[in-house]
């Protein structure tokens, strides 16, 4: 099994505040006296996007997760629930949010480094746990397997398919996100039982790749 996630670079050369329009003007309906700024969401369009994602899953057999780091408006989780396989979290509290708001859905979590004082609680929420390094896998993997969790390792394939985004390319040289082949080979030589802990691999790519 392979897990993949995407990160989208900022498309705008000159970022503007989210509550202004393309010309930098404040929407009149939001900037009057005593009117708080707020997000406006079109539920019909949100559902349409969900239908598109559901169609992709049905045609390909893949699973699409809600990346809570990018969108954690839990009031709308019930709207998205029919279209998505579950949630993706970057730590304990996002994983808990996904479990509380979408209890019947899959709960995936990846963190660059898990905390020992939080990991036992995390096991109450997460179904799939991805580790960033062989060290983290060796430290926490046995407990995750004993709890019946699906265990993965984030890998760095050390291969980029585009230029211009090196500063946040997780596959760039020197990236500390994911395990390189050399790092894995060295760790597996010292700990031959590491491969037995794994159910799959996770790789992260930019959305243009």
Q: Which residues fall in each region the model found?
A:
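An N-terminal domain-start capping segment
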Residues: 1, 57-59
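Alpha/beta catalytic barrel-like cores
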Residues: 1-34, 38-43, 47-49
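N-terminal glycine-rich anion-binding loops that anchor highly charged ligand groups
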Residues: 22-25, 52, 58, 64-65, ...
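Generic signal for short, ordered secondary-structure residues
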Residues: 24-25, 32, 59, 77, ...
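Alpha-helical packing segments of well-folded alpha/beta enzyme cores
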Residues: 46-49, 53, 187
